[in-house]
Amino acid sequence: MTESTTDPARQNLDPTSPAPATSFPQDRGCPYHPPAGYAPLREGRPLSRVTLFDGRPVWAVTGHALARRLLADPRLSTDRSHPDFPVPAERFAGAQRRRVALLGVDDPEHNTQRRMLIPTFSVKRIGALRPRIQETVDRLLDAMERQGPPAELVSAFALPVPSMVICALLGVPYADHAFFEERSQRLLRGPGADDVNRARDELEEYLGALIDRKRAEPGDGLLDELIHRDHPDGPVDREQLVAFAVILLIAGHETTANMISLGTFTLLSHPEQLAALRAGGTSTAVVVEELLRFLSIAEGLQRLATEDMEVDGATIRKGEGVVFSTSLINRDADVFPRAETLDWDRPARHHLAFGFGVHQCLGQNLARAELDIAMRTLFERLPGLRLAVPAHEIRHKPGDTIQGLLDLPVAW
């Protein structure tokens, strides 16, 4: 019997077929569930084709096992300077070609960069940092309690916790937090490429000037160590230092702040699971892992094939883009039964919220420590914490690549 050429699953794997109808990435209707428009991807194979904003078809990975395999495959490049590298949104069209430390380079350069930073983000170093994180969390909750309810949790707690911690770790003055937080927001969610590029320029100028001052007057942050410490591969030049500072500062506060606020909203919207946490039968560390899986706030890792690859019955050609839907990968029912359910009893630590392979998130130990301490202390100190407005009035950040809340009014 002849196989039908109109079979949609087969056609979706054929690069010569018409551009696929599913666009990627998409805004979420609900901040903690994948977009409804991803339904065709969820019902099909772990590898299919989608269309980017500019109409370009690329490969989309939605299965957990396949994602682990491909994220560890050196034939898929993260080099954003390549003209064919997939751009997830129009606002990134110009910025995508600029130098990006760690996330945007391949080995051996990536390995060289990562070796410089690994000691700072090791389990041991982050463990030693936990008392400082706890002190920061307690100080912010003290201020909230003095002011009394209601409070806006994003500005009062979720954003300051990681901002204060990453500033102390890097040696960036927290007094400048309004400047770099605003530029970070524009860089990630600006209305167009010009605004994204201006935000990046302003942030690089600020951090470059800070690095110049640190050369003359050393402090005790990571940037100071990178400037003045001897490195096996030689001194770190100014351009590289600025690139490090940009990625570490943004990644070090933006994603964790979104996880704290969105994680809190998710718990307050799931009373049964929150009751189990408050009863003390579940550790906060377990809750954090399940929230990381369930929320998958960073969507759409990108790669570029550097040679032809046979993958899951399809051929990914050299020069074709590959994107990874973290929100669907972490809802793979073959790995996470009842994946749509928030479940403290499931082993969730093998989620891919931090990526996988050599480019797995360098700061995941820090993020886990901040989330563990912030979430545990928040619900211990404010046992009556609740939403101050109906859930449908909570505004989430517009965006298709990183999820978060604009504000979170709470009372207790």
From Swiss-Prot:
GO terms for cellular component: cytoplasm. Signal peptide: none annotated. Residues 1-38 are annotated as: Disordered. Its cofactor is heme. Residues 1-25 have a biased composition (Polar residues). InterPro entries: Cyt_P450 (IPR001128), Cyt_P450_B (IPR002397), Cyt_P450_CS (IPR017972), Cyt_P450_sf (IPR036396). Belongs to the cytochrome P450 family. One of its GO terms (molecular function) is oxidoreductase activity, acting on paired donors, with incorporation or reduction of molecular oxygen. The lineage of its organism: Bacteria, Bacillati, Actinomycetota, Actinomycetes, Kitasatosporales. Keywords: Cytoplasm, Heme, Iron, Metal-binding, Monooxygenase, Oxidoreductase. This is Cytochrome P450-SOY. It comes from the Bacteria. It holds the Pfam family p450. The gene is cyp105D1. Heme binds at residue 361. Its EC number is 1.14.-.-. It is found in: Cytoplasm.
